Amino acid sequence: MTKIKNYTLNFGPQHPAAHGVLRLVLELDGEVIQRADPHIGLLHRATEKLAETRTWIQNVPYMDRLDYVSMMSNEHAYVLAIEKLLQVDVPLRAQYIRVMFDELTRLLNHLLWIGCHGLDVGAMAVFLYAFRDREDIFDMYEAVSGARMHAAYYRPGGVYRDLPDQMAQYSKSKIRSASAIKRLNENRSGTLLDFIDQFTNGFDANVDEYCNLLTDNRIWKQRLVNIGIVTPERALQLGFTGPMLRGSGIEWDLRKKQPYEVYDRLDFDIPVGVNGDSYDRYLVRMEEMRQSNRIIKQCVAWLKANSGPVMSDNHKVSPPKRVDMKTNMEELIHHFKLFTEGMHVPNGEAYSAVEHPKGEFGIYLISDGANKPYRMKIRAPGFVHLSAMDEMSRGHMLADAVTIIGTQDIVFGEIDR
């Protein structure tokens, strides 16, 4: 008599829907998943160990390369942990700038997520729409830091520099017509804040476009509704955070529950799901984009009305002004020590977490008083979410594995570290 056995399928790490270098070993009964075993580590770069050999400020660019689609949110957790150890006060204007760019980063992340999630499931148009808005946010990154992705803009004590008074404009090009360049430069004649203001005024309408393409689309609903259900109790037991937890109906958001920077001064809502399936998580993230846009508008209004410093005046943490450096020996010494040796952080340990686009992103630092960390531990939200892959996909069809990976919104830079 013939014995029927389950068969094993390797999904990835080269698969286009694997969102990076994910290898899934799937045990299938026909097309039904019986077991899903994620294999990670293919993008491991020893970031935590490298941090022990670099100064505190040299580690900021490494943060950008963890979750490489939510760059400034990673930096934020790191500098908050250092500020806890240093006991330094951050100027209010710098706090508003950080919050504004945190929320722009959330838009950047969620736009890539909806584009790729749609593409994985078979909806190609939304991918093209999403990248239109991402280009504008990359221009904002470039305006403050000179880099379109890996900004390294946040610093312990504030931010690298104030917002520019003039938004950069597109110049003549062989790849664009004169009319296209004129259209691109229409809203770039003012300051960066003017550019962000115009972006936010039109962004809610763009989110409506994405919703019109997907929310009531019957194929989209067939692919997401009742797929990857996680109950509220199980979500807590598994350690879910961010949209994965809120999609299961639990209203937990660090911006509200443990406010940092100026979030307690801002007005916004926390969207939550009901059923805990992939469709609810989609709805939560779409509403999060609207709420982030609302926060950005409030930050822009405050920043336009209020000026001030964007960096701590403690010159053991931040460099002195160039004019002071040329007239004052002590300031010159501070500058020399800061850029050759780096700051010395007092003995101690600190944990700091931010409401990252993917969940709670935490940095745990131990200092032994030296100019570099003694130990750094990164709490990556995607690591926890991917560990639930087996439980979320068991009993679903093979094609649903792609949907579940998409709804988890995983990026291997932070998972493998």
Curated annotation (Swiss-Prot):
Pfam families per record: Complex1_49kDa
SUPFAM superfamilies reported in the protein's UniProt record: HydB/Nqo4-like
Documented EC number(s): 7.1.1.-
Keywords: Cell membrane, Membrane, NAD, Quinone, Translocase, Transport, Ubiquinone
GO molecular function: NAD binding; NADH:ubiquinone reductase (non-electrogenic) activity; quinone binding
InterPro entries recorded: NADH_Q_OxRdtase_suD (IPR001135), NADH_UbQ_OxRdtase_49kDa_CS (IPR014029), NDH1_su_D/H (IPR022885), NiFe-Hase_large (IPR029014)
Broad class of enzyme this protein falls into: translocase
Membrane topology designation: Peripheral membrane protein
Catalytically driven reaction(s): a quinone + NADH + 5 H(+)(in) = a quinol + NAD(+) + 4 H(+)(out)
Subcellular location: Cell membrane
Superkingdom: Bacteria
A GO CC term assigned to this protein in UniProt: plasma membrane
Subunit structure: NDH-1 is composed of 14 different subunits. Subunits NuoB, C, D, E, F, and G constitute the peripheral sector of the complex.
Family that this chain belongs to: Belongs to the complex I 49 kDa subunit family.
Free-text function comment from the UniProt entry: NDH-1 shuttles electrons from NADH, via FMN and iron-sulfur (Fe-S) centers, to quinones in the respiratory chain. The immediate electron acceptor for the enzyme in this species is believed to be ubiquinone. Couples the redox reaction to proton translocation (for every two electrons transferred, four hydrogen ions are translocated across the cytoplasmic membrane), and thus conserves the redox energy in a proton gradient.
NCBIfam families: NuoD, PRK06075.1
Protein name per its UniProtKB record: NADH-quinone oxidoreductase subunit D
Gene designation: nuoD
